[in-house]
């Protein structure tokens, strides 16, 4: 999107370190680096390398927006907030040698007339999914662990549906489309209009949504008719007390079985998200959670411990209590970085590993998806992928938190010739 916001006379190249090594010797006038917390350390290394070569560097993204003073030590300018409305001015300031140290988004930018992302900059054949699109931005909820609210505020903005459809028309419709919205149905009225507009295009798509989508039969029916293959649902926990503590008011544990049944009745698969190790969790959480996910026959699921990202209520409360054990951001991708309340770190780490292994065991996979008729091959393939991936991953995570682990996070930068 930043490339699409760049004036057309500026030459843009994109590098994703997961795919291609960065050429630090390439002639470049300006470098833009996007950083999340888990990529911040490597992002700073990239910035420092370019600056040492005399290249101006811009840092943006959730992490620099949350900790601009930290980020400014590694950049010539820091963008706080969303890029729309800021980026063209920044480019002009750079051209006239008037680059400011900080560019802050004062108001939430309009989503009207957003440019089409420049997908042609992606390395060809390097990504399994290139049909990514967003129709909305933000989330109407304010969960304590979520960095979306701290970055975007508790707002929910929608793009004009005709502009979303115009972008859909630029995608390869035979391939799966992924809506990267934080909650595709955060505004049910808008979602219904969007799904109606999608029906003629006969695409297949997946997206994130809250359990609230199951409370509207017409909305679910339209989602299925428009090509929805799966919904990624944040159940988070099967403890009502935990839901209250994390501010997930949209969820009601007693409704979960009915929610799952209703979504599945429309032929839509469910990928469930669960958090293990919340302050109300004891060692029973592992057995209870995996049994629930198996008994509900969830097609796929992820099980994570809380990650206290800077700027979130979770981070602030744990930091105030002295329970954060490291602020080495490179540890935040795969390691337990806080002290659990009702169990030891070792118990939480081993318990989560056990949940993953049990959920993706061959008997569990067969029980959950073996009798499905729709998308059986795809769902079975995803299960086997998770099984292989996490078995490898957990073998590499047996070291303690304080150990020196390699950084294996996405690192993306844009190079600009002005």
Predicted regions and their residues:
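Alpha-helical structural signal in soluble globular domains
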Residues: 5, 9, 49, 53, ...
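Radical SAM enzyme core and accessory elements
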Residues: 11-14, 93-94, 313-316, 322-418
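Flexible glycine/acidic-rich beta-alpha junction loops that bind and position SAM and/or redox cofactors
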Residues: 68-70, 189, 241-246, 276-284, ...
């Amino acid at each position: 999107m930043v490339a699409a916001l760049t004036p057309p006379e500026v030459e843009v190249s994109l590098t994703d370190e997961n795919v291609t090594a960065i050429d630090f010797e390439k002639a470049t006038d300006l470098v833009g680096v996007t950083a999340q917390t888990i990529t911040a350390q490597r992002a700073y290394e990239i910035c420092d390398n370019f600056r040492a070569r005399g290249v101006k560097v811009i840092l943006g993204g959730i992490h620099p927006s949350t900790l601009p003073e930290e980020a400014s030590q590694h950049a010539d300018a820091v963008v706080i907030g969303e890029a729309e409305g800021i980026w063209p001015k920044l480019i002009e300031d750079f051209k006239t040698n008037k680059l400011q140290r900080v560019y802050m988004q004062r108001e939430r930018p309009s989503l009207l007339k957003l440019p089409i992302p420049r997908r042609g900059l992606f390395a060809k054949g390097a990504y399994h999914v290139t049909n990514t699109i967003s129709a909305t931005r933000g989330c109407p909820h304010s969960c304590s662990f979520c960095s979306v609210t701290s970055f975007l505020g508790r707002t929910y903005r929608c793009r004009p549906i005709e502009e979303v459809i115009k972008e859909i028309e630029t995608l390869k419709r035979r391939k799966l489309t992924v809506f990267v919205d934080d909650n595709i149905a955060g505004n049910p009225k808008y979602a219904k209009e969007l799904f109606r507009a999608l029906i003629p295009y006969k695409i297949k798509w997946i997206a994130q949504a809250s359990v609230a989508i199951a409370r509207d039969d017409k909305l679910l029916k339209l989602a299925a008719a428009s090509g929805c293959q799966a919904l990624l649902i944040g159940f988070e926990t099967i403890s009502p007390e935990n839901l209250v503590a994390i501010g997930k008011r949209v969820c009601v544990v007693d409704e979960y079985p009915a929610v799952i049944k209703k979504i599945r009745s429309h032929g839509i698969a469910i990928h469930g998200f669960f958090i293990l190790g919340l302050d109300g969790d004891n060692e029973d959480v592992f057995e209870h959670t995996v049994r629930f996910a198996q008994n509900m026959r969830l097609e796929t699921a992820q099980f994570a411990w809380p990650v206290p990202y800077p700027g979130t209520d979770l981070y602030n409360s744990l930091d105030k209590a002295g329970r954060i054990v490291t602020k080495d951001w490179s540890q935040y991708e795969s390691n337990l970085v806080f002290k659990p309340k009702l169990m030891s770190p070792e118990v939480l780490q081993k318990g989560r590993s056990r949940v993953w292994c049990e959920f993706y065991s061959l008997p569990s996979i067969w029980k959950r998806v073996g009798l499905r008729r729709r998308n059986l091959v795809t769902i079975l393939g995803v299960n086997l992928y998770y099984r292989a991936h996490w078995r490898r991953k957990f073998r590499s995570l047996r070291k303690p938190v304080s150990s020196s682990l390699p950084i294996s996070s996405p690192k993306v930068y844009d190079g600009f010739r002005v």
